[in-house]
Amino acid sequence: MSKLIVSLSPHAHGKESVEKNMYGVIIALVPAILASFYFFGLGSAVVLLTSVAACVFFEWAITKYLLKEETSLLDGSAIITGLLLGMNLPSNLPLWIIIIGALFAIGVGKMSFGGLGNNPFNPALVGRCFLLVSFPAQMTSWPVAGQMLSYTDATTGATPLAIMKTAIKTGDASLLNQLPDAMSMLFGATGDTFGAGTTGEVCAVALLLGLVYMLWKKVITWHIPVSIIATVFVFSGLMHLANPVYANPFAVIFSGGLMLGAIFMATDYVTSPMTHKGMLIYGVCIGLLTIIIRNWGSYPEGMSFAILIMNAFTPLINTYVKPKRFGEKPAKK
């Protein structure tokens, strides 16, 4: 009989199983997946299928042949990692780069720490950031939405975040006039220039539908996504009022990977705080870091890096922000 090893607090108990929650997330991703097929067609399908298949295969192979353990593919975690990794990639990315990213996400980001429940960082973001650093040209070549039958020969275009970054660097607020209106960005702007981005980020309303579903099914709570989005909205709004070279807050929250990250990646059970107070601190810090990196960092997008940084602080948040024990009183000095 194996020993039961209990980790340090905090602990949580609920009737929901790992599989139920994982497949709840997959269902919530369906609107965004369908939107990606609509905007990017064949390219999106190829990227997502390749990413999911590679993640599932590498988890099976590492578990069976390296760790010599029983595989747990039915829990759905490898599928989610594959979907989220694929949704963070351009729809014209070469297949071999996708496979490398999947190997790094599963092998380094997840299985090297002991598998599901032990990884300190979101595996999909680990894979995405590895590819961004290793293949910056390919990872920042954005196909324009609406090219349904295109894959490797898609025409590339600028993203709203790139325009915002250029406006800040040059101090030219008139560049922001090129941005689509907020409603267009909410539903996915298309055209000769915009609608460019990763497969899962161009249609904010599809991601918000997923958020509504997960809140309804109680897969997640509101604390992390709302605190991230609200923080970015408030501070970007204040910056816009102080200096019009910074984009309006609606353009900021509907562009890039903010919605995808806030709703589906920052809310990962394993890598986010357990208490509601901790979640709010975690979300506010992610929002602030995202603004800092977007406006003054090397990359136009800062969401992935912000989440990974705060993943590292999750154990600290869990340690110092936890419920007071019943009957506990401060020690007298």
Regions found by a protein language model. Name each.
Residues 1-23, 293-333:
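Cytosolic-side transmembrane-helix boundaries in multi-pass membrane proteins
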Residues 120-124, 249-258, 279, 298-310:
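Loop-to-transmembrane alpha-helix initiation sites
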Residues 41-54, 92-101, 193-204, 246-258:
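Structural signature of hydrophobic alpha-helical transmembrane segments
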Residues 9, 57-69, 106-117, 209-218, ...:
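C-terminal ends of transmembrane helices
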Residues 123-208:
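Long hydrophobic alpha-helical segments that form multi-pass transmembrane helix bundles
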Residues 84-153:
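Membrane-interface helix-loop-helix junctions at boundaries between adjacent transmembrane segments
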Residues 1-56, 60, 330-333:
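N-terminal signal-anchor module of multipass membrane proteins
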Residues 70-80, 97-103, 118-129, 222-230, ...:
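Cytoplasmic-side transmembrane-helix entry/capping segments in multi-pass membrane proteins
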